[in-house]
Amino acid sequence: MQERSFFSRHIGLRSDETQKMLDVLGLDCIDTLVSQAIPHSIHLGRVLNLPKAVSEGQALEELSKIMGRNHVHKSFIGQGYHGTCVPPVILRNLFENPAWYTAYTPYQAEISQGRLELLFYFQTLISELTGLPVAAASLLDEATALAEANAVAVRFAREKKTKISLQSLLHPQILSVVQTRAETQGISISENSEICSNTAAIVLSWPDTKGFFNDYSEVIKEAKAKGALVIVVADPLALTLMEPPAQWGADIVVGSMQRYGVPMGFGGPHAGYLAVSDALIRLIPGRIVGQSVDTKGRVGFRLALQTREQHIRRDKATSNICTAQALLANMATAYAVWHGPQGLQEIAQRIHSLTCRFMGGLEAAGIPCEGESFFDCVSVVVKGKAQEIARQAKAGGRLVRILDDDRVAVNFDELSTEEDACTLAQLFGAQLVDQVSPRLWGKGRDAAFLSQPFFHVVHSETDMMRFLRRLSDKDLALDRAMIPLGSCTMKLNAAAELMPVSWPTVANIHPFVPKEDAAGYQEMINQLNAWLCEITGFAQVSFQPNSGAQGEYAGLLAIRRYYQSRGENQRTLCLVPASAHGTNPASAHMAGMEVVVVKCLSDGDVDIDDLKMKAQLHKDRLAALMITYPSTHGVYEENIKDICSLIHENGGQVYFDGANLNALVGLTRPADIGADVCHMNLHKTFAIPHGGGGPGVGPIGVAEHLKPFLPGHAQNGTTHAVSAAPYGSASILVITWMYIRMMGAKGLKYATQTAILNANYIAERLSQAYSILYRGKHGRVAHECIVDTRVLKEQYGVSVDDIAKRLIDYGFHAPTMSFPVPGTLMIEPTESEPKAEIDRFCDALLSIAEEAKKVGAGVWPKDDNPLVNAPHTLVDTLDDAWVHPYSRQEAAFPNHHLDPTNKYWPPVSRIDNVAGDRVLICSCPPLGNTS
């Protein structure tokens, strides 16, 4: 029997359903719809030149052969990446569980309590390890975490101090990212320089890149005396045994949680962490989970202090970070819960003991080693034999790090065995000794840590399985229902696409292995580069950015460096439409550009007259226009080519925000439209799951003239890296490879057409009760539409928040709220949803409009109705004292489409956001501490 094509399973509509939707739109075929929606001037006019689509089985077999060309040696390289054991119970029940990986960022708190709770535990874990009171809910990686910390220090000094003094040796990849960030932010990075009045912070590595702990007591004392902050880059596993950095003066601590049960994956994705003192709370980048209460006083969690973030403060935000690494942070937290504090310390002690015995053996054999104090790494002096030692180690299936011609570093980890240590010692002509004293610096931890009950509840796999299930049951992800978030593209993340991520040949490769050992990765990445170049029309793609916002930053950096190479250093002005995503102005600011806002017209289009005036006014300084297409208003602007030409005529470059690329693939190409650079959200258009707030991948495609200015990497001797690993979150690139390989050109084009059809069908159905705010020339929308709900507020007092919360009772995640227009809903159905689910969603919104009318008619009071009281929990619905003027049935089962056997019950009622920010609680206090 012939296997069905993958794209017929990826796309939610059956052929008869497609025709029914077209009938509602009064159209005979989908091509007619596309021709009405998209300007004729940008139509591609040909089929993409991609390999013919193959089945799931064929794609898996092909990719397996490619990745089989990687050589999985045991890594002793270290340098920020370590072998770790992913507990199977976490691999199966979290990492490979769609209830966890298909969820969106938890902006809608009431339907996100499970992952918010686990992220709250993540923050608690980081606070306990570092001794600092507040931690972010993950950053993109260790290198960007330090770059963000440096920016925090400069902001804390109100930009009167701009020097960061590195007082110890950082890993080369971290140093490179820090230098890149500093270059455009007016920050001076100096190594081992004296602390002066202009020093905002000193940076200490704990341990440093050679594995050493140093006595920093004097330099910390000097920094404190001169008003400089102390930033520490710390290994979180070493911190289980050592005195928390806050106790010896740290104001900020950053690092990577990779070795807490997250595979190396050729560089990512991994969760960076950042913790700060109380004085720095409102300067912290990224998301923070805070504790609050719901309407009944029950504890609930929410994203706190959101006014710091880019979607609100735009170019004045603390950072451009949007997508972080929530899934990996949750994995690391689950790892800590699984092992508990004692288990973590046992792992750390075993690693340290093995390292000490290895070094003791070398010292006994007269082989010089550097450093007095260390945790897991030994730097061995070999006098010109480093290459030969590394070659011999590799011949035995082990990889060590070459520091220079005269020194190698051997880094032990959770997977290292006594046999490994013995064999490596023999390479140096030494034997492992039986027992030696610990070589950690300082007095160690003087008190219990992780005493909170949730780090002690798991004693068996049954406990862990149920712990993760209990949390995931609180959430609404794609495994339960459609998530119609505009500008987020919550499409299917197919099982076959995700399977390879767990393969040893994908997961267990260190990012700095010899090139020949990653031949499979290179081939896969080269193929993906070629495919994405064909899809977008660009000359080259960099996969280093590991989020869309970081892609924006990398693209703008390429533009800036291009102009610098031409001696046009003055070109630092960026035009940004008023309707742009918040990351656009935030990224421009981070890239050292001045942001000038361009007006939009009442129909949602860019105001060409205003654009022309500002482009000509600033033509000598113009660097770029950042533009989203289709626009954030959900329409294809007719004059997009003219807009691009106008910018080029005035000496600028066109930065194309690829957030809405799902409306373009196979139909047109950004480069053909006139773009010079574009980021692609692989976690939107190209099927990588959102993970509840990351991981994401935001590669950038560039035109030929910008190729020399793509991000480099210290490992290759090049500069301007934007993330720690050469290919960013490399291991999840296989998801996009699988997606494109199985869809083929025909499937990709049909997916885009179906996404446009679904959005137009929704717009048509909802226009019975709501105004569709923006439409194109022929009355069509793109792949998303903006529904104006302000009339319900004006006539009946029902807010967009009330509608969003009421949708939970109907079993839905709310669409994007109040962007780009306050009081509206932006709806994006994607191509993956079946017609029945789309109809169920439309019915829900139409029913809510009828409920609002009842409020307006006085059937229900404005202060006591199903909308203002939404969402309704099971406990509240069963309450003996039901005092509302509407029935329990109307509260919990508001229309006949709700299946009582498949009902989603929110665990909390509406969360009090004001209370959560007024009394900020970002971690759980230790047992016995109620302060």
Curated annotation (Swiss-Prot):
Keyword Amino-acid biosynthesis assigned to the entry: answer is no
Indicate the quaternary assembly: The glycine cleavage system is composed of four proteins: P, T, L and H.
User: CDD domains, alphabetically?
Assistant: GDC-P
Q: What is this protein called?
A: Glycine dehydrogenase (decarboxylating)
The protein's required cofactors: pyridoxal 5'-phosphate
> Mind listing the UniProt keywords for this protein, alphabetically?
Oxidoreductase, Pyridoxal phosphate
Stated family: Belongs to the GcvP family.
Q: HAMAP family this protein is in?
A: GcvP
The record's Gene Ontology biological-process terms are: glycine decarboxylation via glycine cleavage system
- The answer, when asked if Oxidoreductase is one of the entry's keywords, is yes
* Reaction(s) the record says it catalyses: N(6)-[(R)-lipoyl]-L-lysyl-[glycine-cleavage complex H protein] + glycine + H(+) = N(6)-[(R)-S(8)-aminomethyldihydrolipoyl]-L-lysyl-[glycine-cleavage complex H protein] + CO2
Q: What class of enzyme is it?
A: oxidoreductase
N6-(pyridoxal phosphate)lysine modification sites are K684
